[in-house]
């Protein structure tokens, strides 16, 4: 604990929490302070100008990051009939119906994403209280309820992330590992922001991207100067 406290105190002395950092300054700074013994993730928090109390302004969506997130994603698929072989051929880690539902009910959830074909939702819907709080319930908006099982698996395996805002209108997600090249992390961030811009609810007014912060798993959080990002996200 003492070492952690000393490390965080040293980092805190080098970070100006009132400053908005240029993205090309922020990434190297976060890399310099990633000194723990594992490869940390780079996380982003995007404060949006939405009213999260209104369902019409809530965002549930997905996008593909050009450089992935730095780890393999395990996919479970609810499928029956010909979709079983389609899912297996496409690279699903688990495929099933009642057996997969039983595994989930027992709390044995050793996968990251659940995909379901529409004809299996009568079963999947019974698992809502388990999958919902984990953010794993299949959803048409994120493409995880689909007729095209093979495409959904391919997109997820190739670096797709799914995201939704919390009650404060903030999107929290991972955009890669801190050992990525700086340009890869920047391009992943800008891909997310472009996707969020497309997701912008029609009812929102005023500033949409209110605040963008980057942090590593065990490191400090830096507020990003939006002027240093691509004009596509302004």
Swiss-Prot record:
HAMAP family: Ribosomal_uL1_B. Belongs to the universal ribosomal protein uL1 family. This is Large ribosomal subunit protein uL1. Part of the 50S ribosomal subunit. InterPro entries: Ribosom_uL1_bac-type (IPR005878), Ribosomal_uL1 (IPR002143), Ribosomal_uL1-like (IPR023674), Ribosomal_uL1/biogenesis (IPR028364), Ribosomal_uL1_3-a/b-sand (IPR016095), Ribosomal_uL1_CS (IPR023673). Keywords: Repressor, Ribonucleoprotein, Ribosomal protein, RNA-binding, rRNA-binding, Translation regulation, tRNA-binding. Binds directly to 23S rRNA. The L1 stalk is quite mobile in the ribosome, and is involved in E site tRNA release. Protein L1 is also a translational repressor protein, it controls the translation of the L11 operon by binding to its mRNA. It comes from the Bacteria. The keyword Repressor applies. It comes from Baumannia cicadellinicola subsp. Homalodisca coagulata. Gene3D superfamilies: 3.30.190.20, 3.40.50.790. GO terms for molecular function: rRNA binding; structural constituent of ribosome; tRNA binding. The keyword Ubl conjugation does not apply. One of its GO terms (biological process) is translation. One of its GO terms (cellular component) is cytosolic large ribosomal subunit. Transmembrane segments: none annotated.
């Amino acid at each position: 604990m003492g070492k952690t406290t000393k490390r965080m105190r040293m980092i805190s002395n080098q970070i100006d929490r009132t400053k908005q950092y240029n993205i090309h300054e922020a990434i190297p700074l976060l890399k310099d302070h990633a000194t723990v013994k594992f490869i940390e993730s780079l996380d982003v928090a995007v404060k949006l100008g939405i009213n999260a109390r209104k369902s019409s302004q809530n965002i549930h969506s997905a996008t593909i990051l050009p450089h992935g997130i730095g780890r393999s994603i395990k996919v479970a698929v609810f499928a029956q009939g010909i979709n079983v072989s389609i899912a297996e051929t496409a690279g699903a880690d688990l495929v099933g119906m009642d057996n997969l539902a039983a595994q989930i009910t027992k709390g044995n959830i050793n996968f990251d994403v659940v995909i379901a074909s529409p004809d299996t939702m009568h079963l999947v819907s019974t698992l809502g209280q388990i999958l919902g709080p984990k953010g794993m319930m299949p959803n048409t908006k994120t493409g995880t309820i689909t007729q095209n099982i093979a495409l959904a698996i391919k997109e997820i395996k190739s670096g797709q992330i799914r995201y939704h805002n919390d009650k404060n209108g903030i999107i929290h997600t991972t955009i890669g590992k801190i050992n990525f090249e700086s340009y890869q992390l920047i391009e992943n961030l800008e891909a997310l922001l472009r996707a969020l811009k497309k997701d912008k609810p029609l009812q929102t007014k005023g500033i949409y991207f209110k605040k963008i912060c980057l942090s590593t798993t065990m490191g400090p959080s830096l507020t990003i100067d939006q002027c240093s990002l691509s004009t596509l996200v302004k």
